[in-house]
């Protein structure tokens, strides 16, 4: 073990789990192991290994070839507490803390931030779904020395809030999600394993397949997906209708969403729908790549979406997308300014969001649908946040566009989508994610100054 490496304590979903937070936590760790040692307080809802210490050094050394790779997990049910954190700090003696996911999960961490920042910095890999600027998050953001914003919209939010508190440019960085291009890629037509996968789920019977791969929860609007698909298929002659299919890779029933089989039975009883998640068995990377390759278009109609990892995975597999213009989904659209250059994170400091359609020119790999209704929602902990609703008829028209252009054009546009995601200036591969994390953290280590033991502030 190299004593020259900085050790970082990661607070997030267990890197071995399958959630979006877990997936990106793993990519961050695996793509920076050559630079840092990692310890994780590894969260799960009811963690079966709570109280154990999991040493993954041999596993990651074998996988990466990095001889001094260091990764140790401290599993916990929930996101931890001050006692667990203090114990792990005492054992591991990290040089910094990196936490990730919604700030409301970290109120206990923010309550002791001053105690911690006297000795080590706190970093935050953060995202916020929508406008208006959440000033109720101000004190949460101020508990971190470095904020890495996952979306351009979040970068703008962080900047607008923290510029009033003396934060310097190095303390706020745009650091988008990244996926491994070796796990998500275009499979050649006729591949035996892909054909076997399609046969297993009955996908081989259809010529045009629309994929929903998301959680079955309200803000993802799976019911609107059904209605958009209906609007699309209703426009086709009967023989062509039979050759189309809607794929749901999600739990068919979820108390946080709906009963999708009941919705489909009522709304599209005569149209083809396939559920690939009936047994709640999570697909491995290879199977996820198969399903993106099998689909002709990927669809995300979420009315609040921090980033939209699955649409990026679709682009990496060279599958065109239809997305609602909200949150981080707009970063995957390749919106351009009047001079032909892409919108940057700094543009979003003033723009806020492109959900009102100020900029319309976009990449050929996507049919963006702008919200037809923007309403202000809220709760006691999040008093206000916009809900961006796309009209399902407009989404149906976007699906019809991809149907009409045919497979050759879809293939061409899908390839452009992968090229966009892999562009080093876009930064949406796993390796580029690691590079961006290293750049931000190394700068923070260089410039960070410990907090004074006591501070006074006018309130």
Language-model segments: which ranges?
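Nucleotide-activated donor-binding/catalytic signature segment of Leloir-type glycosyltransferases, i.e.
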Residues: 257-286, 290
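Conserved donor-binding/catalytic core segment of Leloir-type glycosyltransferases
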Residues: 10, 203-220, 226-229, 246-247
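Short hydrophobic beta-strand element within catalytic cores of glycosyltransferases
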Residues: 320-323, 340-344
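N-terminal subdomain of nucleotide-sugar transferases
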Residues: 1-58, 92, 457-459
């Amino acid at each position: 073990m190299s004593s020259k490496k900085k050790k970082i304590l990661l607070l997030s979903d267990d890197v071995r789990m399958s959630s979006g937070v877990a997936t990106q936590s793993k990519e961050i760790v695996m793509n920076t192991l050559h630079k840092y040692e990692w310890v994780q307080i590894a969260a799960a809802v009811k963690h079966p290994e709570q109280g154990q210490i999991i040493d993954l050094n041999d596993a990651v050394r074998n996988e990466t070839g990095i001889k001094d790779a260091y990764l140790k997990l401290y599993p916990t049910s929930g996101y931890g507490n001050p006692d667990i954190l203090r114990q792990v700090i005492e054992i591991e003696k990290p040089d910094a803390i990196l936490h990730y996911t919604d700030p409301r999960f970290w109120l206990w961490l923010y309550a002791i931030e001053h105690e911690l920042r006297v000795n080590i910095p706190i970093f935050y890999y953060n995202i916020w779904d929508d406008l208006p600027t959440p000033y109720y998050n101000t004190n949460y953001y101020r508990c971190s020395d470095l904020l890495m914003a996952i979306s351009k919209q979040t970068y703008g939010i962080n900047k607008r809030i923290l510029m009033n508190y003396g934060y310097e440019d190095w303390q706020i960085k745009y650091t988008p999600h990244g996926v491994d291009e070796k796990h998500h890629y275009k499979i050649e037509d006729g591949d035996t394993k892909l054909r076997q996968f399609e046969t297993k789920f009955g996908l081989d019977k259809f010529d045009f397949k629309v994929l929903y791969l998301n959680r079955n929860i309200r803000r993802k609007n799976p019911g609107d997906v059904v209605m958009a698909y209906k609007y699309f298929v209703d426009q086709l002659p009967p023989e062509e209708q039979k050759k189309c299919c809607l794929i749901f890779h999600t739990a068919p029933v979820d108390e946080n969403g709906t009963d999708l089989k009941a919705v489909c039975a009522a709304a599209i009883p005569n149209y083809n729908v396939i559920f690939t998640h009936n047994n709640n068995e999570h697909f491995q990377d290879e199977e996820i790549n198969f399903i993106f390759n099998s689909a002709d278009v990927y669809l995300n109609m979420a009315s609040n979406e921090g980033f939209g990892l699955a649409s990026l995975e679709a682009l990496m597999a060279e599958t065109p997308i239809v997305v609602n213009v909200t949150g981080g989904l707009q970063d995957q659209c390749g919106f351009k300014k009047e001079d032909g250059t892409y919108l940057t994170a700094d543009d979003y400091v003033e723009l806020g969001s492109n959900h009102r359609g100020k900029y319309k020119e976009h990449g050929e790999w996507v049919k963006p649908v702008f919200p037809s209704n923007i309403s202000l929602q809220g709760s006691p902990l999040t008093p206000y946040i916009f809900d961006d609703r796309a009209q399902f008829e407009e989404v149906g028209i976007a699906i019809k566009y991809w149907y009409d252009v045919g497979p050759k054009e879809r293939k061409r546009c899908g390839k452009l989508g992968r090229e966009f995601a892999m562009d080093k200036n876009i930064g949406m591969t796993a390796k580029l994610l690691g590079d961006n994390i290293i750049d931000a953290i190394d700068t923070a280590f260089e410039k960070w100054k410990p907090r004074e033991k006591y501070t006074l502030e006018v309130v």
